[in-house]
């Protein structure tokens, strides 16, 4: 993957706080470049040593949903998962940005029932399923979505379970000062080594805190997540269970036709990958002892998917699924091939 140097603002100079980015992906039409996507990517080991980088490895980004697996660590480390006998499918959903399919909704609901709660406890907000099939079926039945359809409902169900198991009132768990959320933030800080405080805190789409974090710290954290190195014993054990759960249930992590599900179904435990909003992806290559993090400057998920697939091809054996995501044929409404999106 030959990432080329490119300023995030082209000839007008660099955006404030950004070093030169790298060209990560481009869109071609008729053999000519129509659009380009720049950004930064870094691969680290568990000690934080940079193995590969393009763009600015210290570039800070809000990791968004890319760190859901790290946010799920207290669910296991606190023994909440054991207390409520959460299944591997439920643990996978706790790491997911799901499509709102019936199986996703039912699984989140089952998690809450084990804690004696229901969907009214969720504070993630409500949106229609991202699966058009699921959304149309819901509307055709005369129903409207609930918080259980939110793509983050599995993660939030895990937060509610953790609070209940600790004897806490789960109300307000999305706030930065709620004991459960403090444990979640503390886990992410411990794994990544990043300083997470009010000065770099924002509010995520599902209303929990999200913190501006250097890509290098995210990559290091995922190297640790993938290997257990430099982690407390309880987090190391939790990481293994979460990785295995997601690998065993790839349909839970996202949904049919989506990047996370297709890559996980193809590679199993060879790679852990997770997408986040605004072009952030992160993950681990456990057997190689590496973690990675990537941010596309303009937030384009299509570019992040392609660049992540190409990055995996750099470190792993060739695989048809990776190659298809790294270089995607673009078609129009008549089904004609009109161009391609490709990592560069």
Where are the regions a protein language model picked out?
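Active-site-adjacent helix/loop patches that line small-molecule binding or acyl-intermediate pockets
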Residues: 2-18, 87-198
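Beta-lactamase-like hydrolase cores
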Residues: 2-6, 10-58
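Short Gly/Pro-enriched turn/cap motifs at secondary-structure boundaries
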Residues: 30-33, 149, 270-274
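Short glycine-rich loop/turn motifs
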Residues: 36-41, 157, 185, 278-281
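A short glycine/serine-rich beta->alpha loop
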Residues: 54-62, 94-98, 141-150, 202-209, ...
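Active-site SXXK
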Residues: 63-80
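Bacterial peptidoglycan biogenesis and beta-lactam-recognition machinery
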Residues: 76-84, 116-120, 167-172, 178-185, ...
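Structured C-terminal helix/loop/strand segments within mature extracytoplasmic catalytic/sensor domains
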Residues: 223-344
């Amino acid at each position: 993957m030959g990432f080329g140097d490119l300023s995030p603002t082209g000839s007008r100079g660099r955006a404030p706080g950004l070093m030169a980015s790298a060209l990560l992906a481009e869109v071609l039409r008729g053999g000519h470049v129509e659009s380009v996507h720049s950004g930064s990517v870094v691969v680290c080991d568990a000690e934080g040593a940079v193995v590969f980088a393009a763009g600015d490895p210290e570039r800070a980004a809000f990791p968004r949903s890319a760190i859901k697996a790290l946010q799920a660590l207290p669910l296991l480390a606190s023994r909440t998962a054991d207390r409520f006998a959460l299944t591997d499918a439920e643990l996978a959903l706790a790491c997911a940005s799901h499509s709102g399919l019936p199986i996703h909704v039912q699984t989140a609901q089952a998690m809450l029932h084990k804690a004696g709660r229901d969907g009214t406890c969720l504070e993630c907000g409500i949106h229609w399923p991202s699966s058009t099939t699921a959304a149309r079926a819901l509307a055709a039945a005369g129903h409207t979505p609930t918080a259980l359809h939110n793509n983050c409902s599995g993660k939030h169900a895990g937060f509610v379970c953790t609070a209940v198991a600790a004897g806490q009132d789960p109300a307000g768990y999305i706030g930065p000062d709620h004991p459960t959320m403090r444990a979640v933030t503390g886990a992410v800080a411990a794994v990544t080594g990043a300083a997470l405080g009010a000065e770099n805190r924002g509010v995520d789409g599902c209303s929990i805190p999200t913190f501006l974090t250097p890509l290098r710290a995210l990559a290091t954290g995922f190297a640790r997540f993938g290997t257990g190195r430099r982690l407390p014993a309880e987090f190391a054990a939790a990481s293994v269970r979460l990785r295995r759960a997601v690998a065993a249930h790839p349909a839970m992590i996202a949904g049919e036709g989506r990047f996370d599900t297709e890559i996980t179904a193809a590679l199993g435990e060879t790679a852990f990958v997770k997408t986040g909003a605004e072009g952030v992806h992160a993950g681990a290559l456990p057997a190689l002892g590496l973690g990675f993090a990537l941010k596309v400057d303009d937030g384009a998920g299509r570019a992040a998917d392609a660049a992540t697939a190409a990055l995996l091809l750099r470190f792993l054996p060739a695989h048809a699924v990776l190659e298809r995501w790294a270089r995607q044929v673009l078609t129009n409404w008549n089904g004609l091939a009109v161009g391609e999106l490709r990592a560069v």
